[in-house]
Amino acid sequence: MESNHVKMISGGKCMNNNEINAAWFINKYHCNPESIKVVMINEAVPEDVKDDFYVPDSSYSQSIIGLFSNAGILCDMQELLEKGIYVCNAVKTPKEQSAIPLVQIKDSLDELEAELALFDNLKVIMLMGDVARKAFNMIAKKQTGKNVIPSGSTYKLRHNEYYYHDIRVMLSYICTGGNLLIEKSKVTMISEDIQLMLSIIGDCHE
């Protein structure tokens, strides 16, 4: 993951890249990365930054809040952070077509890898869709020499247990977009996956 190259900041204090990234995370989300137990990796950032996860009343945030509500958890995005659940996107640039090309996924890998490196206490990584699966498999293969999730349909694989080191890796479906309004079965399956994730981290329904 991102190197520990040391940088100087004001006051002469030395900080490595992970410390700088952690300070950025705390400043942006008002949450210590050490408290994060779950990362949900979605597909790609929205075309408009105002639609992203941590913008109040955005389309992305409403999708997540609705899915957690279906799973029995009534909360907003900040409350999810307080529970130790962080949501991000695998691809850091908006998609320009329905299928995201591999080169675009690869262009965001370093940033995603550095993002995941912030969280020392992860228990679960949820891969929300095929793009997240591809991106995470590439990171895992770089680190360990092999994929975490094998080839196959999400429907057939989502009930299997996979691990990256000692972190449970769960395969699910994209958690944003208009398809959620149409494909009610996927909403049900995502909510089931969220319930399983909550049971793994020991969170109870409210």
Label each region the model flagged.
Residues 1-69, 163, 196-206:
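Active-site and ligand/interface coordination hotspots across diverse enzymes
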Residues 2-23, 94-113, 118, 138, ...:
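C-terminal capping/extension of enzyme domains
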Residues 30, 77-79, 159-161:
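Short secondary-structure boundary/capping segments
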Residues 51-52, 135-139:
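A short acidic (Asp/Glu
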Residues 54-104:
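Short, surface-exposed acidic-centric catalytic microdomains
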Residues 131-133:
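Alpha-helix capping/helix-boundary segments
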